[in-house]
């Protein structure tokens, strides 16, 4: 055995030789091993650091320098270590073998590493402690065995590691505390047994760990802690029992006299007993949130003079504020998601150093005066039931920087409530019931949130908030004062892109000191927002205001262009005048009964007139607010005028579509019924259907008034809201579009069936060619105009592809109401019924008499191809009697086609020739009386009928008779 002087001489010789080699040529020579080829080496004086990590090595390099002090072999493919592999590395102090595939380490693997202090073996596949290998490491101070598969720690696992200070055994498969193995570590200062499967902590489990300062036991399955479990931990300062299954408060902590930080959150503890922390007067931080706390002893948190952080969240059954008498050093208090209803008046006297008060998600209805809490910097009171803010509630809080009062029921704020808050930089009043906001004391605000206060239409100027950087308001019009409209409307993404500054992004973001403990407090205050208050006051060119104005939230004009403005006015004038004229001629033209189709067309004119009136209201608002719409936009959207406009628009458009569907279906069914049963449906069923259509349209228009859909989503007061609208509003708009699309499909199917039932040459089914053709024109025109509405609505609301808001707005303003003026124009210009009805209203001196109009009215009910009509026998008698009496005045100017009358319901059909009825086989009857019950086919020939345009030659009556040239 060498003597100590001999060893010293040997060591000095080695050092001198190494120094000589280091001072000579740095190129490797025959006397000096080179750095292994795949590794990266760095010299530190005479010592060497070798980094061989992440190289895919399967074996340890053999040519390592004996003076290597640091060796990193982590993240490779090592599967085994040969005995004596590191015996020549006598100066090695840190060895990293983490992230390999080691499942077993032989006994002599670390022999010769007498200077090793740090050994990292985490993230391997070890199933046991390599005890024999560790015995060769007398100087080891830090051992990492976490993230392995270790399930058992034998008693002698750490024998000989008398210098070990840090031990990581977390993320393994341990089911119990290795009590006997830990008794051999008297110098241990920090240990983690987290992320295992431990269920119980026995008594005296750590009795020999008198130097232990930090103990982590979180994320286990611990259900019970013995009364003396922590006996012997005289120097323990941090205890982490979070995320376990504790059922009762661990009274064993009373033996921890030096404990400063305690974590019990996310357990099943239901009660905190009286004097729970009596034995730990040095406690500074307690995290106790997310436990089903039902009881808190009145003295539980009293006289903890060092306590500065208390987090007690999720205790839903706690209704009283805890008594914090003697806890005068408390700086951060978090009591969220509890049932607290009232704050004691003397809370600030007990907590004079309080800086952060977080009481969100409680049931607080009234706030006391907090003027004695002079050091308060943040107050969180969101999701409570506060209704009013008094003058002295926050008075004299000169250090207050952030105040969160969102999601309450605040209706009134005293004008002087914020007047003394000179340091306030963030104020959140989202989703309250404010009508006005007092501005006194808010000049230093940099972030103001007012969203959700729908009754707050107050305009804010730049002078009110000279330092403001972020503003969130209920209406986009309130952003117009901050120059948002300077370069027309922009989307939110564009504004965010313009407000982005690379230098600000690259700047280091350090949390404020007052927020240092918030990661565990669940107090979700935005660090970036509060950082604005401490940054140097450099000028900022613009304010980031939301929601951003756009085509649906204009700043100056409701209608952006004169083209749209003139088009809307034209639609208004044409729809009101033309539909009024149609209504007048249809319903006031005389006592003659209306045909079913004509009744439906008249009802459609009334619906279209409502659409025109709604467009007129929008045009009037545009004219009255010309150039300054932002001042009135919020009040218009939330007012009764917008509701009435939207109601009329939806009622008119939906009634028009439904009535058009009814007209098409009625035409198709009538043809089928005439062919099958010889008669058309009764007019009463058509009237009932029309009333049903109007009732359904009224119901659809009333749904947004009951919060199903939304009229005030935009100043257009239409349910077709922009994509950023509420889901309920978008769903209602999609439902309307789908219903209308279904109606047009039904209409198309009905008319296809009608034409399929009328093959060429079959002329006995259609009784009113003009009205049937008019309905066909309505189907074509309205369907064609509705296609872009449906297409853009689906594309915009469902985000199928980008659609500019300007295009959507133009379609809603011009294309959507266009049928309201086009439908009556088609009737006025192309339907012969209008000219006849107009003559009845204003007869001219040369116009035919009423009898001639009656006959003409019957004759006009003819088909476009054969001009046949169904006429009752009583009507034919009137015509025949008139022919015998003489010609009415002016009748010579009115042309009638020649006709043949054929019985529809007699077995042997007859026809009229001269003054006799002749059977179909040619037999004549003298002065016969036609049957009173039944109908005749009136066949017109030799004339061009209004509305049909077809002519057939050959008159059958003598020309000398009164109607010989006409009937």
UniProtKB/Swiss-Prot annotation:
It is a multi-pass membrane protein. The chain crosses the membrane at residues 568-588, 599-619, 645-665, 688-708, 728-748, 775-795, 810-830. Pfam families: LRR_8. Specifically expressed in multipotent stem cells in the epidermis. Keywords: Cell membrane, Disulfide bond, G-protein coupled receptor, Glycoprotein, Leucine-rich repeat, Membrane, Receptor, Repeat, Signal, Transducer, Transmembrane, Transmembrane helix, Wnt signaling pathway. It is found in: Cell membrane. Residues 589-598, 666-687, 749-774, 831-967 are cytoplasmic. Residues 26-66 form the LRRNT domain. Residues 25-567, 620-644, 709-727, 796-809 are extracellular. LRR repeats lie at residues 91-112, 115-136, 139-160, 163-186, 187-208, 211-232, 235-256, 258-279, 282-302, 303-325, 329-350, 353-374, 375-396, 399-420, 423-443. Belongs to the G-protein coupled receptor 1 family. This is Leucine-rich repeat-containing G-protein coupled receptor 6. The gene is Lgr6.
